[in-house]
Curated annotation (Swiss-Prot):
Residues 351-435 form the KH-like domain. Associates with the 50S ribosomal subunit. GO terms for molecular function: GTP binding; ribosome binding. The lineage of its organism: Bacteria, Pseudomonadati, Pseudomonadota, Gammaproteobacteria, Chromatiales. Belongs to the TRAFAC class TrmE-Era-EngA-EngB-Septin-like GTPase superfamily. EngA (Der) GTPase family. This is GTPase Der. GTP 2 binds at residues 183-190, 230-234, 295-298.
Length: 464
């Protein structure tokens, strides 16, 4: 399971800038809920072969009670779940009393902690760091999140702080295909999970997962083994804030990271709302197989049903490859139909695409709809081969291949999807321009070619 890094500090010390630097502004998820979860950002970051989640806990503001309720409400859950804490301070403004108070609060968390001095560009590092040693948090890392200076050293330090999780994803004692049920509050996730497990009779007790209280619940459906991945953690519910209990984004991210296929549950009564779009985007970025379950479909008026279908097409065009099921988790209608789509998504995500068949499909696609002309020359796509699975990755080589437009990219993805029947999974395309080994080199003629050219010149002059 991927580790979690929490960014903590007072306002305007550069937490959001560092967040965007680490995540490259991808996978960012803003949960707009009143109270404890307002404007908390979550994202996935990569460094080398290491992946980890990042959470920006928001600024800690000074109040009469010191850190007070705002700090505990906004950051407590993220810090409790975090494996590592980055405590950001402002190198321009220097040490403040609020910094000292936050440092004392963080020490009580008893988590790996790294002091990060931001906004240090153009300043003497030793001089900037000197006053922060009094915090007693060890050697600080000096960075400029805006310019990227020192971020590499910070990430190297992070690798030494990341714990060895009790069991990695590959070590979870799970049976069969692993899938997760994801959705915003009150869409019927728990009802759907209970319906699935209640109907299929859980074969064994909950298997303890990693330090995140994740559980893997094996069961059998029509003679086939599955494992439901759940990171909600029954034990956690008794010790977290009520509002946070309803919707913890990091739990959803962890579920997505572990699962092979994700079921996105949408409430038919509300149709597609912003939180649905956020979660759908996170699932898409993860590259996992996906199935959409529109819950509470029973009893919905015909006019409202049509409106929901229209919203699905209009607001989720980037998940056009996902099978959509209209279900009632409460009454069980349509729940059994989810399993063929789960299987299909998994098989598609792990498909082996023979090179010969890929090239024939590429040739047919290009003949049907040639690539556009760029700078007076038509793009030539010459050959393709598979570059990975889960999701399927297709590498296409050609001339000016990097100039392929987004529209033509979508056309090729849809063509490959139809040609190979890849439903329930995204498809990744990578274009590589074939390098011309003679580009930039003078065309030097051999002696024989030079003599031939002279004869042609004399011949043309003789005709004139």
């Amino acid at each position: 399971m991927n580790a979690l890094v929490a960014l903590v500090g007072r306002p305007n010390v550069g937490k959001s800038t560092l967040f965007n630097r680490l995540t490259r502004s991808r996978d960012a998820l803003v949960v707009d809920q009143p109270g404890v979860t307002r404007d908390r950002k979550y994202g996935l970051a990569h460094y080398g072969e290491q992946s980890f989640f990042v959470v920006d806990t928001g600024g800690v503001m000074e109040q009469e009670s010191g850190i007070g309720r705002l700090m505990r409400a906004q950051a407590q859950l993220a810090i409790e779940e975090a494996d590592v804490i980055f405590f950001l301070v402002d190198g321009r403004e220097g040490l403040s009393s609020l910094d000292e108070e936050i440092a004392a609060w963080l020490r009580c968390a008893q988590k790996p902690l790294k002091l990060v001095i931001n906004k240090a560009e153009g300043r003497d590092g030793d001089l900037v760091a000197s006053e922060f040693y009094r915090l007693g948090l060890g050697e600080p890392i000096i960075i400029s999140a805006q310019q990227g200076q020192g971020v590499g050293r910070l990430l190297e330090a992070l690798l030494t702080l990341l714990p060895v999780l009790e069991r990695e994803e590959s070590e979870i004692q799970a049976k069969g295909l692993q899938f997760a049920v994801i959705g915003r509050p009150n869409v019927g996730k728990s009802t759907l999970v209970n319906r699935i497990l209640g109907e299929e009779r859980v074969l064994s007790s909950e298997i303890p997962g990693t330090t995140r209280d994740s559980i893997s619940i094996p069961f059998r459906h029509h003679g086939k083994d599955y494992t439901l991945v759940d990171t909600a953690g029954i034990r956690r519910r008794s010790r977290i804030l009520d509002k946070v209990e309803k919707f913890s984004v990091i739990q959803s991210l962890q579920s997505i990271a572990i699962a092979q296929v994700v079921i996105l549950v949408i409430d038919a009564h509300d149709s597609v709302v912003e939180q649905d779009l956020h979660l759908a985007g996170v699932i898409l970025e993860s590259g996992k197989g996906v199935v959409i379950a529109v819950n509470k479909w029973d009893g919905l008026p015909l006019e409202q049903r049509q409106r929901v279908k229209t919203d699905l097409d209009r607001r989720l065009p980037f998940l056009v490859f996902a099978r959509i099921h209209f279900i009632s988790a409460l009454h069980g209608s349509g729940v059994g139909d989810l399993f063929p789509s789960i299987d299909e998504a998994y098989q598609s995500a792990n498909s082996h695409l023979p090179t010969g068949e890929l090239n024939r499909a590429l040739l047919a696609a290009v003949e049907k709809y040639p690539p556009p002309v760029v700078k007076g020359r038509r793009i030539k796509l010459r050959y393709a081969h598979q570059g990975g699975q889960n999701p399927p990755k297709i590498i296409i080589h050609g001339n000016q291949a990097e100039a392929v437009s987004a529209n033509y990219r979508r056309y090729l993805i849809n063509y490959f999807r139809n040609a190979f029947g890849l439903m329930g999974t995204p498809i990744a395309l990578e274009f590589r321009t074939v390098k011309n080994p003679f580009k930039g080199r003078a065309n030097i003629l051999t002696q024989r070619q030079q003599q031939k050219r002279k004869r042609l010149v004399r011949f043309r002059k003789g005709r004139d």
